Amino acid sequence: MALSSVSSCEPMEDEMSIMGSDTEDNFTGGDTCAEATRGLVNKSAFVPTQTVGTVSALRNVVGDPPKSVVVSFSASPQRAQPSNPKSERPAFGHGRRNRRRPFRRNNWKQQQRGWEKPEPENVPARQSAGSWPKRSSLPVHMRLGQRGGDSSSADSGHGGAGPSDRWRFKTRTQSVARVHRNRRRGNANHGSNTPGRSAGDRLNAAAASSIADVCRRVTSSRIGEMFHGARETLTTPVKNGGFRAENSSPWAPVLGFGSDQFNPEARRITWDTLVEHGVNLYKLFEVRSHAAEAARSLRDAVMRGENLLEALASADETLSWCKMIVTKNLPMRTRDPIISSSVALLDNLRLKLEPFMRCYLSSSGSPTLAELCDHQRLSDVACVPTFMFVMLARIARAVGSGAETVSRDALGPDGRVLADYVPGACLAGTLEAIDAHKRRCKADTCSLVSAYTLVPVYLHGKYFYCNQIF
């Protein structure tokens, strides 16, 4: 029977276009509706090839129209529309109307009107309907993510079976966590380059005039007057006689202001002497408040200008003083001149030892110097330098917090960490660590840094001195 006689089972033109067929070659005969219906199936679709995958072949079956797996709103397909039977383009999957529209930043609602709402069963389990990120002005590669599968596989994604590669970007999948991370990164970069910064970040007229007129304000004669006035101020640093220690006090020679230059060997004492007479100096710091205030200011300035050997000796002085206070069961007052200057001492030691400690700590797998001083964990102590930095950082933190006293627990449980400390260990242990690392490290630059840290003699680094004022 001819195909025209099967009027009740004859496929309509729209139905044929939905099946993706433009001819009637598959309907060569058959007297029944079942035979005509069997002729509607494209048998060649069940033959797998190298270029068309199994999923794409099953999509040609009329009885099972394809369902698109929606991985993002930008990849949602439109409903299949009937097309011209004479057209060579397929009616669904990759039609002209299904091409990706450009993202409209200010017209997102109009772009979303013609799209289907994603079915809950087709949404991936790791991306629920409530976890989709909001649209923003992020770049395309940050919004769309990475490609979902291999371009050579038709089963790797929704658009992998297309006739060309121009739809393959629809297979991109996006992690919600990556979207929010990229958004935070973009906001951080945007915050560092604010649009109004370039307009307002400029010198005002008063500052520009002050910088330009410095050559007229400062001359060589005025420089001489500055130094002369500074010397006069230092001749009488403290009023009311200073600490006014008794002549019989063992601390009388060291409590004067500007009497003699500091000589470490001339002022060397033993640990037993410090334990015996240290309480007298402790009380003088507490009673003579005006002298103690001047002592704090001057000692803070001295700590910042010391060389490495002097700074290490000051570290031993600070820890020995704290150990004496713990031994005598006295409160460690933060207004004590020796304890108060621990902040300046720590800054100077970090400045002097930072180049060496960078390689020294990394070679042993220890935390960086900044992490040691910030975290201040006793578990990070592995040698004398790390012990020195952790203990000074704990004392400096208490001083900087504004507390009246330093807690005994800051020096370990009930201050027992200093029980094994021997006065002079900071100087001897740090010098030993520098020399041992210098012999062990193979890097040439590290050898130079270690040697210059021990012997800071000028070899190279300064290239010119330019001064057109005086």
UniProtKB/Swiss-Prot annotation:
<keyword id="KW-0244">Early protein</keyword>
<feature type="region of interest" description="Disordered">
    <location>
        <begin position="1"/>
        <end position="31"/>
    </location>
</feature>
<keyword id="KW-0479">Metal-binding</keyword>
<keyword id="KW-0804">Transcription</keyword>
<comment type="function">
    <text>Multifunctional regulator of the expression of viral genes that mediates nuclear export of viral intronless mRNAs. This immediate early (EI) protein promotes the nuclear export of viral intronless mRNAs by interacting with mRNAs and host NXF1/TAP.</text>
</comment>
<comment type="subunit">
    <text>Homodimer. Homodimerization is required for transactivation. Associates in a complex with RNA, and host export factors NXF1/TAP and ALYREF; these interactions allow nuclear export of viral transcripts. Interacts with three host shuttling SR proteins SRSF1, SRSF3 and SRSF7. Interacts with host SRPK1. Interacts with IE62; this interaction enhances IE62 transactivation.</text>
</comment>
<dbReference type="GO" id="GO:0042025">
    <property type="term" value="C:host cell nucleus"/>
</dbReference>
<feature type="binding site">
    <location>
        <position position="441"/>
    </location>
    <ligand>
        <name>Zn(2+)</name>
    </ligand>
</feature>
<dbReference type="Pfam" id="PF05459">
    <property type="entry name" value="Herpes_UL69"/>
</dbReference>
<comment type="similarity">
    <text>Belongs to the HHV-1 ICP27 protein family.</text>
</comment>
<keyword id="KW-0945">Host-virus interaction</keyword>
<keyword id="KW-1035">Host cytoplasm</keyword>
<dbReference type="GO" id="GO:0030430">
    <property type="term" value="C:host cell cytoplasm"/>
</dbReference>
<feature type="compositionally biased region" description="Basic residues">
    <location>
        <begin position="178"/>
        <end position="187"/>
    </location>
</feature>
<dbReference type="GO" id="GO:0003723">
    <property type="term" value="F:RNA binding"/>
</dbReference>
<feature type="region of interest" description="Disordered">
    <location>
        <begin position="62"/>
        <end position="204"/>
    </location>
</feature>
<dbReference type="GO" id="GO:0008270">
    <property type="term" value="F:zinc ion binding"/>
</dbReference>
<protein>
    <recommendedName>
        <fullName>mRNA export factor ICP27 homolog</fullName>
    </recommendedName>
</protein>
<feature type="binding site">
    <location>
        <position position="437"/>
    </location>
    <ligand>
        <name>Zn(2+)</name>
    </ligand>
</feature>
<dbReference type="GO" id="GO:0006355">
    <property type="term" value="P:regulation of DNA-templated transcription"/>
</dbReference>
<feature type="binding site">
    <location>
        <position position="359"/>
    </location>
    <ligand>
        <name>Zn(2+)</name>
    </ligand>
</feature>
<keyword id="KW-0805">Transcription regulation</keyword>
<feature type="binding site">
    <location>
        <position position="446"/>
    </location>
    <ligand>
        <name>Zn(2+)</name>
    </ligand>
</feature>
<keyword id="KW-1048">Host nucleus</keyword>
<feature type="zinc finger region" description="CHC2-type">
    <location>
        <begin position="359"/>
        <end position="446"/>
    </location>
</feature>
<keyword id="KW-0694">RNA-binding</keyword>
<feature type="compositionally biased region" description="Polar residues">
    <location>
        <begin position="71"/>
        <end position="85"/>
    </location>
</feature>
<keyword id="KW-0862">Zinc</keyword>
<dbReference type="InterPro" id="IPR008648">
    <property type="entry name" value="ICP27-like"/>
</dbReference>
<keyword id="KW-0863">Zinc-finger</keyword>
<keyword id="KW-0010">Activator</keyword>
<feature type="compositionally biased region" description="Basic residues">
    <location>
        <begin position="94"/>
        <end position="107"/>
    </location>
</feature>
